[in-house]
């Protein structure tokens, strides 16, 4: 199942029989191991692939909200496990539903303790290489489904950021980080009360961490190779490694000119 096949979530694919003949319910607001019994549910995966494919050309993607009525409708359809034509929803709605799913994960995708570890690594003046090592260790401790979700997310953030100069999306790594950090790092959210100085500091740290991961995407010391391979396979790209030991991703059409 690749980016080219997301339009109607129907009956599976040649490489993953678990999607055949049924649609898994997407559970909002439950722990990740309950939400992802096997791996990323089909509909959520298709939303990620839609944003990965169409998002780079869309202005303010990840920052501009989707239509709230459509966000509620799509969320309900996903929770009931009903068939859905993804093409009936805008890429902004897709991105908003993804952020909603992340924001409702109890403790966040990383967990409170891991968030604190990442904040400490970013706030103590630790050099960027050691910060990557901390992230790599935390990433490796997460369930495989969480790893798959994160590598698809950050790969998508990166392709959007890479297009910020050539398109009108205006979403460079810092702009994306500011827009998505609260969905990924729940301890930087101030729970509706008046924001304190420390809340703002944590939000800034969270944004800096997300921005750094986006900019480092492809680094061999950030995500394991098998996760980069997962990202390449599901987005329909070819994985290569360059002279700087960085993984790079190429669309099939660009292979003719490589």
Predicted regions and their residues:
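Intrinsically disordered, low-complexity regulatory regions in eukaryotic signaling/scaffold proteins
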Residues: 1-38, 46, 123, 133-145, ...
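Catalytic and GAP-homology cores of small GTPase regulators
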Residues: 2-129, 215-218, 225, 229
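Amphipathic alpha-helical interaction surfaces
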Residues: 100-108, 159, 163, 186
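Alpha-helix boundary/capping and short turn/kink residues
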Residues: 107, 144-147
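Alpha-helical solenoid repeats of the armadillo/HEAT superfamily
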Residues: 148-152
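HEAT-repeat alpha-solenoid elements in large eukaryotic scaffold proteins
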Residues: 154-157
């Amino acid at each position: 199942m690749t980016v080219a096949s997301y339009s109607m979530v129907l009956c599976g694919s040649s490489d993953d029989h678990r999607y055949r003949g049924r649609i898994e319910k997407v559970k909002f607001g439950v722990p990740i191991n309950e939400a992802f019994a096997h791996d990323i549910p089909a509909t959520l995966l298709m939303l990620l692939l839609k944003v990965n494919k169409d998002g780079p050309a869309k202005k303010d993607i990840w920052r501009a909200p989707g239509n709230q009525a459509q966000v509620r409708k799509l969320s309900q359809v996903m929770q009931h496990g009903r068939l859905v034509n993804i093409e009936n929803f805008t890429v902004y709605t897709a991105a908003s539903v993804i952020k909603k799913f992340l924001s409702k994960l109890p403790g966040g995708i990383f967990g409170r303790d891991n968030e604190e570890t990442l904040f400490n690594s970013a706030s103590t003046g630790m050099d960027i290489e050691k910060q990557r090592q901390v992230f790599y260790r935390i990433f490796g401790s997460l369930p495989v489904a969480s790893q798959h979700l994160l590598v698809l997310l950050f790969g998508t953030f990166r392709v959007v950021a890479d297009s910020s100069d050539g398109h009108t999306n205006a979403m460079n790594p810092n702009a994306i980080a500011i827009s998505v950090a609260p969905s990924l790092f729940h301890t930087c959210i101030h729970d509706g009360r008046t924001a304190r100085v420390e809340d703002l500091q944590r939000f800034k740290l969270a944004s800096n961490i997300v921005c750094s991961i986006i900019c480092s995407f492809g680094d061999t010391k950030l995500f394991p190779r098998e996760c980069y391979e997962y990202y390449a396979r599901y987005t329909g790209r070819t994985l290569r490694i360059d002279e700087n030991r960085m993984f790079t991703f190429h669309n099939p059409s660009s292979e003719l000119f490589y």
